[in-house]
UniProtKB/Swiss-Prot annotation:
It comes from Pseudomonas aeruginosa (strain ATCC 15692 / DSM 22644 / CIP 104116 / JCM 14847 / LMG 12228 / 1C / PRS 101 / PAO1). The gene is rcsF. NCBIfam families: tRNA_TsaA. Keywords: Methyltransferase, S-adenosyl-L-methionine, Transferase. This is Putative S-adenosylmethionine-dependent methyltransferase RcsF. S-adenosyl-L-methionine binds at residues 22-24, 63-64, 91, 122-125.
Length: 231
């Protein structure tokens, strides 16, 4: 038996590429985006009652990781990319039907549009459904997960004077918390866990319309070098 599903809308996100997206939602509160709804769900009637809700679940498609051949085992980044687990024991992007889910903060809404924060979604992500977060049912007090029982340790982030100034200027232009977004995302250490950084190597990612570059002066430290773009 097969079923077809259609997106109810698409995400417009601060994340223009997969690299440096937090591996779980809400780890970067400054990560903002909007969900633009498609007809007929762009009518305000579909959103009545959401003013009483602080967070929502988004069900979406990993549209850049869809595969014809299903994977039974995957290598989750949490385990360094060197150890494999059954696909259903992980939140890896390579899913049987390419479906993901994230809980995000609902900042506001109007007909056809939801404003969100704490997102971990790529720009252009197709969204399949929205469900309200229900604290008494969704927060399981005695839940356990021996694979990921706590947030991964963060990494220290420092700035060059130029990068700090650029982030402030672009934040004012975009009316977005650019410096906070960069710091919160880089503190998750986006490089592959198996990769030992070399001090001379520059890393980069595109956030909003900005190209952010950094390096690792030490394995336990990121230094933001420049924040360019917006031309």
């Amino acid at each position: 038996m097969t079923h077809s599903v259609s997106p109810i809308g698409y995400i417009r996100s601060c994340f223009m590429e997969k690299f440096a997206i937090p591996r779980q939602p809400l780890l970067a509160p400054a990560a903002r985006g909007t969900l633009e709804l498609l007809p007929p769900f762009d009518q305000v009637e579909a959103l009545e009652g959401l003013e009483q809700v602080s967070h929502v679940w988004l069900l979406f498609l990993f549209h850049q990781a869809l595969e014809d051949k299903p994977r039974l085992k995957v290598r989750p980044p949490r385990l360094g990319g060197n150890r494999s687990l059954g696909v259903f024991a992980t939140r890896a992007t390579h899913r049987p039907n390419g479906i993901g889910q994230s809980v995000v903060r609902l900042e506001g809404f109007e007909a056809g549009r939801l404003w969100l924060s704490g997102i971990d979604l790529l720009d252009g992500t197709p969204v399949l459904d929205i469900k309200p977060y229900v604290p008494y049912a969704d927060a399981v007090a005695d839940a356990r997960n021996g694979i990921a029982d706590a947030p991964p340790p963060g990494i220290a982030v420092e700035w060059s004077e130029q990068a700090r100034r650029q982030a402030h200027e672009h934040g004012q232009r975009l009316r977005q918390p650019v410096a906070e977004l960069i710091e919160q995302c880089l503190a998750q250490d986006p490089r592959p866990a198996y990769q030992k950084p070399e001090p001379g190597r520059r890393y980069g990612v595109r956030l909003w319309d900005l190209d952010v570059h950094w390096h690792y002066p030490r394995p336990d430290l990121i230094r933001v070098l420049d924040v360019a773009g917006g031309d």
